[in-house]
Regions:
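Surface-exposed binding/hinge segments that line
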Residues: 47, 53, 152, 196-246
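N-terminal lobe/hinge region of extracytoplasmic solute-binding protein
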Residues: 105-155, 162, 185, 196, ...
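Aromatic- and charge-enriched surface segment that lines or borders ligand/interaction sites
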Residues: 149-193, 207, 211-215, 223, ...
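Extracytoplasmic/peripheral linker and loop segments enriched in polar/acidic and small residues
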Residues: 160, 376-380, 384, 392, ...
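Alpha-helical secondary-structure segments
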Residues: 177-183, 211-215, 266, 296-299, ...
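Gly/Pro-rich hinge or "lid" segments in bacterial periplasmic/extracellular proteins
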Residues: 230-295, 299-301, 425-426, 430, ...
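Ligand-site clamp/hinge motif
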Residues: 255, 286-333, 376, 472-474
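Structural transition elements
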Residues: 397-434, 451-455
Length: 630
């Protein structure tokens, strides 16, 4: 299945074989019809913000280019965009291509092949090709079956998973319930950096060879999403090689599972790998997902290159084909280079402004009359003073305007929530006067200078915007590593932070940022010290509600409160960007994790000038890898 995006419109389809039409099977999936040889079929196209439509997809026998017939009532631009999307996807996989090497570079080094040893998202993006989970994300961010063929909720705290039969590990061993039980218990054990995600799991029970029950302490409606990162290992292989425990993932670390792998995924690790060396992945010819490998990338060679400049030079010299963690400041220049293609899409991270709404007075500021951020009118006035067009311009369009604290694609997001109020200085000044701050006040803005694309420039742009309503801002520019402890110790009055949704659900955003802070994990980054009983009740209900429709409604109500109370000021949703040779056909997935089974490598690689890749002033900073969600 291929997912493509253009002009904000998303289409999902499988490839088209000669003489095989499509028929509709699910809302976001096309499947080859059993009536092969007929000329016509129906396909399903999902449009962002629009109802589903079913265009005709015609792929006659003996032809190499399908025709797409779209409803005549659609606007011309929409018809052109959708036709281009579908043809790109259909043509991309219509003709089988011979295997071709794909060389992939990123900043993060793989120090262990143990799927339970490193929580870093880039490491998991690589190891997902080798080790699989019970569930996975579809290109449309829906949870779909992987090693589990189906599942159901037996009671509010017991989930039953039925394993897919016929699945084999790379060494030929069959997948059993014993392997799943062992893997989930291993993941929760000592040494695992991923164990916290299963903190609410009480036990894993084997029902038979292909059925398990996961018993929880409390209802956990997100369990199928959480399990997408719970990789399954072979128990017998682990026991034979004394790899039943997770060893710390450090350079030079020992342990059989550190240097060897035995998963069920579409790729397997080539022999001879050791930490510090490029990791070569070879196609698994016995993968269970027949027809799920439309690409031709084989082998895939992953190489860690720490320096941004070195990664881009390697791309220019033709030494690598794909770079997936670029500094956003480089994107405008890279888009102008003829030898490369840059793909961008909105990520799951949102930049926002937070304010201390608890203290009686500002620790870093001067107002003359208490803490102005405790007044919703002041917070609302600050939001009305922000000019989104200016922010987009100074950030090289590497952001998308945001009206809520979660990004598009995250469960709970709606277009209405994400709609920003227009800049209105007159109304903002009126609100400031009503709150008793017509003369304004002084405050310090803590701003990271090495974490997000154009982070300091965005902070600098906010200064004159807020000055127009009397708020005099001084910027405290500091590394991201210094900002985090300030927030953890409540040592800030005003700050900018980015926050993401690794499980594509708004609950963790709300729990971390807006839930009343306590001695427990709840409200960990609620440095604003928001404490709203109604908001807390909605979050608690969403945390334990197993009905997905009702639960999404609860999340949307909670996000509406955050928006109307101006508890945070959303600035923008960050864009993600990958750069690759023009010989590479790859669409950036919303998950930000490339699936190499979809990649098609064609033609010859073209280089670009080294001068064009030089870092611009103030933009060549290396952004450190941080937590998944900040």
């Amino acid at each position: 299945m291929l997912a493509l995006r253009r002009n904000g419109i998303r289409a999902v389809s499988t490839h088209c074989n000669h003489g095989q039409p499509f028929m509709t099977t699910r809302a976001t999936q096309l499947k080859v019809s059993p009536l092969a040889g007929k000329r016509h079929g129906k396909g399903c196209l999902r449009l962002k913000g629009m109802p589903l439509e079913y265009p005709d997809l015609v792929c006659s026998a003996g032809t190499s280019r399908p025709r797409v017939s779209l409803p005549t009532g659609w606007p011309t631009r929409l018809r052109r965009t959708c036709r281009a999307l579908l043809l790109a996807g259909l043509m991309g996989a219509a003709l089988p291509a011979s295997a071709a090497t794909l060389r992939w570079a990123a900043q993060t080094e793989i120090t262990s092949l143990d799927p339970h040893a490193q929580a870093h998202p880039q490491v998991q993006a690589v190891l997902q090709h080798v080790y699989e989970s019970l569930t996975r994300y579809s290109p449309g961010l829906e949870v779909e079956p992987a090693l589990a063929q189906r599942w159901e909720l037996l009671t509010p705290v017991i989930w039953r998973f039925h394993l897919r039969q016929g699945v084999r590990f790379h060494d030929g061993s069959p997948l059993t319930a014993e392997d799943v039980q062992f893997s989930l218990e291993r993941l929760k054990g000592a040494g695992s950096t991923l164990g916290t995600m299963l903190a609410g799991v009480r036990s894993v029970r084997r029902i038979d060879e292909h059925t398990i029950d996961i018993v929880l302490d409390k209802p956990m409606p997100l369990l199928p999403r959480i399990l997408t990162d719970a990789r399954i290992m072979n128990r017998r292989w682990s026991r034979t090689h004394r790899a039943e425990a997770v060893l710390a993932s450090k350079p030079g670390g020992s342990g059989y599972a550190t240097r060897n792998a035995n998963g069920t995924g579409p790729y397997r690790v080539a022999e001879g790998w050791a930490p510090g060396l490029p990791l070569q992945l070879e196609r698994n010819p016995d993968w269970w997902n027949t027809g799920g490998f439309p690409g031709n990338a084989d082998p895939v060679i992953y190489q860690a290159i720490a320096s941004d400049d070195d990664r881009l030079r390697a791309l220019e010299r033709g030494e690598v084909d794909l770079v997936t963690d670029l500094p956003g400041q480089r994107i405008p220049a890279l888009k102008r280079l003829p030898g490369l293609q840059v793909q961008t899409d909105v990520s799951q991270r949102t930049l926002l402004i937070g304010m201390d709404q608890f203290s009686d007075s500002l620790r870093y500021g001067h107002t003359g009359m208490g803490n102005p951020f405790r007044d919703q009118r002041v917070r609302h006035a600050m939001a009305l003073a922000i000019n989104e067009r200016t922010l987009m311009r100074i950030s090289g369009n590497m952001y998308q305007p945001a009206g809520t604290i979660v990004a598009p694609g995250v469960n709970g997001w709606t277009e209405a929530l994400d709609r920003r109020e227009a800049t209105n200085l007159r109304q903002a000044r009126q609100l400031m006067a009503q709150a008793g701050h017509a003369a304004g006040f002084e405050v310090t803005l803590d701003c990271p200078n090495n974490r997000y694309a154009y982070d300091q420039q965005i902070c600098e742009a906010l200064v004159p915007m807020w000055a127009r309503i009397g708020i005099r801002v001084k910027i405290n520019s500091l590394p991201f590593a210094s900002l985090v402890p300030k927030l953890e110790t409540l040592d800030s009055s005003l700050w900018m932070l980015g926050w993401g949704s690794p499980d594509f659900d708004a609950l963790q955003n709300l729990l971390s940022l807006a839930y009343t802070r306590s001695d427990k994990v709840d409200g960990t980054y609620n440095a604003a010290r928001i404490s709203d009983p109604k908001l807390d009740r909605l979050i608690d209900q969403a945390r334990y509600e197993n009905n997905p429709i009702k639960r999404t409604g609860l999340l949307q109500q909670a996000l509406e409160i955050v928006k109307t109370q101006s508890y945070y000021l959303p600035l923008a949703h960050a864009m993600r960007a990958w750069v690759m040779q023009r010989s590479i056909s790859l669409v950036v997935p919303p998950s930000e994790r490339p699936e190499m089974r979809f990649v098609i490598v064609t033609g010859r690689r073209a280089g670009v000038s080294d001068t064009a890749l030089a870092a611009p002033d103030r933009a060549g900073r290396n952004q450190p890898a941080g937590a998944q969600n900040k």
